[in-house]
């Protein structure tokens, strides 16, 4: 009986083994079949509009980086294409095609992209089809520029033009955060920047051009830049075309952008008790005694340690303890974490059979990141900020079938405010560039002044009137004094650009393709500076840990009231340009030619005037 049971069990085990093997083969076979059905291999050949093989065409699975390219004979093989995926065939100058599913072999015929072939770029005195340009030219579309939150066009170009190096200076403060541009490296001829032209007129810079006014930007980077601009174009040319109106109903566009700016990286904070512990550790490593006792470190952690709340002069003791055992974060004391920036824009465009129009009004407010005292307390405002109002009106007139005229008017009014720091850094008080050294000084001092240092102003509990500046004997000047107590610097700029041009098509009068173009532009630039300078006495602070007290000693006794100075300057420029143009197609041949002349007249020296006077309150000051 026992032997029979063993035989039955053995048979059952054999049956289980066979069943398991069959099931495993079924699963593997099903998985293999499923894998075979979930991906496929596709092949094909790509031809152009003339049925010629196209090498170098990209075939890629949409949403992935997996793809291949056609060989010299236009054929391709793409393996492991997931079921249900989209395969795209693309080539520069041709319209993209999507391969339909359900096939494994394709014959693809690409169609030229007519829009790309007709795309034009601005070149010197006119426009040219992009496909026919042989020089090194980069273009930037207006839609790309309007995506940025930058308030300056020169900063917005950074990273959007190949070979363009943009180096920002001025400390990054509002109104003085300009960028110096170089094409193909900073080692340009005499270290000069590219020549800048807006609608064909030479400009000193493009920082005030509203990005909502720009239609396109072309950057000439090789010999094509010197063909018509000579040595001025040796470092490249940046050509900016502003927007024009199109025939049709009026289109109104309103936009508002609110953003906040901040430093990309900020230093970590060191607390006062952490400094004391690290200082003791450093002295211990040198075999020296500790500078701060455990009691002092404990009081830095809790300034109210050991005080009796029932004491009659408890409030006074609290004030004194907090002044002695301070934990100052000078970086945050001098600099804000976030700064607001606002931008509003309104434009309208349209046209009729006689005139096309584009009108744009823009406003920008850029706040500063300095933590300054209240203007009501100081009597003036040393904060960094910029306000700019800009206007552009482009009108195009169709006088006759062959004669057109354009009138472009652009203007801006800008107000830039900042602390009066020019004289502190050995520069011209009227110069804005010294702001760069101010920011460098602030960041340096915020990391140099110890968190246990009292300040930034005196306290009346220790024998000196409150509110006086505290200096530190290991620094040349106090950062608090720089941004608050030295005065203010206001720069007001106004600019007006007027441009009139005519274009006469002589195709019917003389010969087909011949035209004459003339243009005159008159620019005026006015600048007014109002600066208030003052000086206050400063003190040193000494901490007495034995008595939990502070003492002040006079450092600089020199004082002077707020002294006002103003500068005014103005200059103008007259720009005249004319050209004869010829463009005609003979069969498959395009013939173009141009003869041009230009003249620039102006007064670059301007008119400067200086006035000095003293003012008691220095409140609500306008130029």
Functional labels for PLM-detected ranges:
Residues 2-392, 405-406, 472, 607:
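Short, small/polar-rich motifs associated with maturation and membrane association
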Residues 141-145, 409-413, 520:
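Conserved short loop/turn motifs at secondary-structure junctions
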Residues 164, 245-252, 348-357, 397-407, ...:
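Secondary-structure transition into beta-strands, especially the periplasmic turns and strand N-termini
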Residues 185, 242, 346-352, 393-397, ...:
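Residues on the lipid-exposed face of transmembrane beta-strands in outer-membrane beta-barrel proteins
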Residues 197, 214, 391, 518, ...:
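Extended, hydrophobic alpha-helical segments in both membrane/secreted and soluble proteins
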Residues 263-266, 322-362, 366-370, 382-476, ...:
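Flexible loop and strand-edge segments within Gram-negative outer membrane beta-barrel domains
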Residues 275-288, 295, 299-326, 426-478, ...:
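Surface-exposed loop/turn segments flanking beta-strands in extracellular/periplasmic regions
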Residues 364-388, 418-420, 425, 487, ...:
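Small-side-chain secondary-structure face that scaffolds active or pore-lining regions
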